[in-house]
């Protein structure tokens, strides 16, 4: 410790601060700087030529002797990657010739498939209708034969055969509706019973004609 540090703060020099060592540097003044105060007759300084004395504390001296290393990852946040936050701008690619050709080919294939399906459905349903008509004719012939056989057993003639024939037609249609696989395995629809009934009616028109003619003669 120096003598200046052992003394009290009273009477200490102006550049003395407790706990701080000072570096004494000479202060040079210009004669023009000194001016006399007319009231107090004390010279005052307006401008200092030399710099202000530099004071250094013990802590700053220790810090300068042992510089600290600052790691970016310890206390300082990492800089944000701007590329992550920025939205990706997707460039719209114009369709190439290959893509256009592929779309055209797909549309053509879809049209071909639709045409084939309509053709197959038309042939299938058309074939079903033709088969229904043929089946109706065969069933009409069978109904006529069965009606004549029943009428011959009971000795019925003329208009008496009509109710028997009508009952047989209803029974045949009912059987086809309940289990169409027994009588007609190829049937896949149930909306062509009218097509079946018309051939039966036409085939069995002989008994219907007799019935309506006798009914007309009665009235």
UniProtKB/Swiss-Prot annotation:
GO terms for cellular component: membrane. The keyword Transcription regulation does not apply. Residues 70-102 are annotated as: Disordered. Residues 96-120 form a coiled coil. The chain crosses the membrane at residues 126-146, 153-173, 192-212. The keyword Membrane applies. Keywords: Coiled coil, Membrane, Transmembrane, Transmembrane helix. It comes from the Viruses. It is found in: Membrane. It is a multi-pass membrane protein. Residues 73-101 have a biased composition (Basic and acidic residues). This is Uncharacterized protein L631.
């Amino acid at each position: 410790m120096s003598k200046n540090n052992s003394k009290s703060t009273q009477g200490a020099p102006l550049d003395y601060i407790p706990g701080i060592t000072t570096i004494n540097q000479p202060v040079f003044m210009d004669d023009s700087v000194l001016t006399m105060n007319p009231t107090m007759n004390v010279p005052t300084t307006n401008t200092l030529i030399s710099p202000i004395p530099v004071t250094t504390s013990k802590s700053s001296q220790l810090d300068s002797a042992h510089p600290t290393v600052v790691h970016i990852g310890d206390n300082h946040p990492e800089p944000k990657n701007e590329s992550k936050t920025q939205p990706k701008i997707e460039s719209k690619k114009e369709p190439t010739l290959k893509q256009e050709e592929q779309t055209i080919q797909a549309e053509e294939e879809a049209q071909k498939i639709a045409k084939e399906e309509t053709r197959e459905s038309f042939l299938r349903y058309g074939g079903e209708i033709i088969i229904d008509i043929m089946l109706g004719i065969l069933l009409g012939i069978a109904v006529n034969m069965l009606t004549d056989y029943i009428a011959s057993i009971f000795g019925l003639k003329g208009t008496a055969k009509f109710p028997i024939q009508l009952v047989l037609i209803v029974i045949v249609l009912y059987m086809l509706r309940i289990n169409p696989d027994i009588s007609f395995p190829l049937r896949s629809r149930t909306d062509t019973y009218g097509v079946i009934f018309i051939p039966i009616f036409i085939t069995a028109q002989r008994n219907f004609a007799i019935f309506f003619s006798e009914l007309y003669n009665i009235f």
